[in-house]
């Protein structure tokens, strides 16, 4: 079963919603409370329910606000939730198709300083993924505690998938060896867009590139964008990866497993 996730004939971003997801949608949305896990029950308590028209308005408004100010992380988060439902169902389907992905969906791990022992990761051998991630956080002065909570998705299962995507963003940076400057953020957004199909990622990739300085834009077109596209052709889906169980794995072996070639 572990292999099924990697046998998808088309990249996730180009897959259509398959018919079997209709029943999954119904089951996930209408399940009795006693059949939901702790994350799902807690999400339903704080979920903000909106109508289709309100969703349209929020999507348009957050899109405009994100373009005007890319630092409005609340608007970027809102955009992701109001435009990404179909892509999230596809991601959920992909995760359910592999043993590792199913384990994530059952255990619903969270990534923050309360759940991860960063001191332990820092003490690991430097060639491990755990040490690579800890070094990324330190070098870029970032913390896993800054991710926005999900509010506007109807289905709690999709809410977890979106939560997982957000909390894994820095892990993707680390495994790609990409810092957090604007050029690399745009590049990572392209990788995420092509790997997940999330409209928000495409928007960040396309419109983020517009804000690059001339020198950055030349490097982006000459090296970074071609690298992101070429890597994405061979890269395995990242969302089914249980990163927290890979801390001790050699980071180069992990990259080879995922089909990632670093930018030279």
Swiss-Prot record:
<dbReference type="InterPro" id="IPR007715">
    <property type="entry name" value="Coq4"/>
</dbReference>
<feature type="binding site">
    <location>
        <position position="185"/>
    </location>
    <ligand>
        <name>Zn(2+)</name>
    </ligand>
</feature>
<comment type="pathway">
    <text>Cofactor biosynthesis; ubiquinone biosynthesis.</text>
</comment>
<dbReference type="GO" id="GO:0031314">
    <property type="term" value="C:extrinsic component of mitochondrial inner membrane"/>
</dbReference>
<keyword id="KW-0862">Zinc</keyword>
<keyword id="KW-0999">Mitochondrion inner membrane</keyword>
<feature type="transit peptide" description="Mitochondrion">
    <location>
        <begin position="1"/>
        <end position="26"/>
    </location>
</feature>
<dbReference type="InterPro" id="IPR027540">
    <property type="entry name" value="Coq4_euk"/>
</dbReference>
<keyword id="KW-0456">Lyase</keyword>
<keyword id="KW-0479">Metal-binding</keyword>
<feature type="binding site">
    <location>
        <position position="169"/>
    </location>
    <ligand>
        <name>Zn(2+)</name>
    </ligand>
</feature>
<protein>
    <recommendedName>
        <fullName>Ubiquinone biosynthesis protein COQ4 homolog, mitochondrial</fullName>
        <ecNumber>4.1.1.130</ecNumber>
    </recommendedName>
</protein>
<comment type="subunit">
    <text>Component of a multi-subunit COQ enzyme complex.</text>
</comment>
<feature type="binding site">
    <location>
        <position position="170"/>
    </location>
    <ligand>
        <name>Zn(2+)</name>
    </ligand>
</feature>
<dbReference type="Pfam" id="PF05019">
    <property type="entry name" value="Coq4"/>
</dbReference>
<dbReference type="GO" id="GO:0006744">
    <property type="term" value="P:ubiquinone biosynthetic process"/>
</dbReference>
<comment type="similarity">
    <text>Belongs to the COQ4 family.</text>
</comment>
<keyword id="KW-0472">Membrane</keyword>
<keyword id="KW-0496">Mitochondrion</keyword>
<feature type="binding site">
    <location>
        <position position="173"/>
    </location>
    <ligand>
        <name>Zn(2+)</name>
    </ligand>
</feature>
<keyword id="KW-0831">Ubiquinone biosynthesis</keyword>
<comment type="function">
    <text>Lyase that catalyzes the C1-decarboxylation of 4-hydroxy-3-methoxy-5-(all-trans-polyprenyl)benzoic acid into 2-methoxy-6-(all-trans-polyprenyl)phenol during ubiquinone biosynthesis.</text>
</comment>
<keyword id="KW-0809">Transit peptide</keyword>
